[in-house]
């Protein structure tokens, strides 16, 4: 696909999905439906947004040159977000086992925790159990991290 918008919807609650996607030329928006678990997934986007609502992530990585990441869900294991331009918004919910988060953002805003941009992101980061590691690199823009 060389022009236009590619919309990817994953809505299979009873399955664990592996999603490996590389896209270079046109804008891509990925919507991931609720009740889905993505395991060992990797998304590399040159242009586009990643919009995730109510999803379980297991050892996943997202690399984006331009675009926004809007994430609401539960993390298990290692999760890496690497965004060169654009905003990263993460609202984490539910009880989790050990997890590792790396968020690197060269330009734009980085928000992790409760309602940062939008009141609809009312979930809060609740540190319930396990060992947690958070690495944040933000060269330009605002960084907001909330622990409750």
Regions found by a protein language model. Give the residues of each.
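Right-handed parallel beta-helix
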Residues: 1-72, 122-148
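Short, surface-exposed interaction patches in beta-rich subdomains
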Residues: 71-148
């Amino acid at each position: 696909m060389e022009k236009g918008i590619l919309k990817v919807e994953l809505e299979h609650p009873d399955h664990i999905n592996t999603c490996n996607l590389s896209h270079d030329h046109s804008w891509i928006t990925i919507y991931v439906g609720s009740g889905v678990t993505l395991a060992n997934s990797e998304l590399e986007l040159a242009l586009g947004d990643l919009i995730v609502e109510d999803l379980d992530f297991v050892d996943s990585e997202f690399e984006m040159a331009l675009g926004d990441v809007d994430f609401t869900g539960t993390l298990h294991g290692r999760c890496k977000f690497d965004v060169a331009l654009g905003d990263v918004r993460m609202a984490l919910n539910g009880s989790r086992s050990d997890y590792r988060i790396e968020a690197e953002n060269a330009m734009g805003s980085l928000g992790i925790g409760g309602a940062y941009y939008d009141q609809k992101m009312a979930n809060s980061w609740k540190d319930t159990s396990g060992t947690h590691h958070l690495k944040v690199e933000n060269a330009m823009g605002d960084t907001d991290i909330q622990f409750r």
